[in-house]
Amino acid sequence: ASWQPVGKDLAQYKSECRHGIGYTKISADYSDIHSEALYYVPLGKSYEVWALSVTNHSDHERNLTLSGYAEFTNHSNYEQDQVNLQYSLFISRTLFEGNRITQQIHGNLDAIPENENVDEKNVTERFFGLAGAEVSSYCGDKNEFLGSYHGYGNPEGIVCGDLGDKTSYNENSCGALSCKITLKAGETRTIAFLLGMKPSSEAAEVIR
């Protein structure tokens, strides 16, 4: 279930997208696997939840790799992100911590005490995390995720089934996480990807 299906033949792949008040649900069917992704922001919270449910409609056990991908901006200021690209690339990096990718803006200032402000450039952190399963591989670099001569229709990390465990430093950042699950015939499993802008310690509590 995806906003952009990864190059499947529409004779075999079916999808449906529904928008409601405060949520979007995308369902898909392919090769006897049914998936539903529900996107929403919990009431009173400041992060997104992407709840993904996968059901095995075949008559045998299936081994699946589930992946989520979020493309970060390099700066919260539009002008800096879109115009001053050399600068915004320089100040962006990603880290992997347990069950999440953390993107740092002005990460080069991370050695400065948390409450000390340098030229109004405190370190800003965004996160893309996984709840309900263990991360099997990750990628924090957009170019590494897509791969050479690949695009969003066939990203190398998805085609290979392994995201390569790469982070980004002075490049275009992203958050990509994969997990491996086994479903018995008729079984359903639900996991959740979470996306937001919070310090790492707060992100850990959100995902827990």
Cite the ranges covered by each PLM segment:
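Anionic coordination/interaction segments
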Residues: 1-208
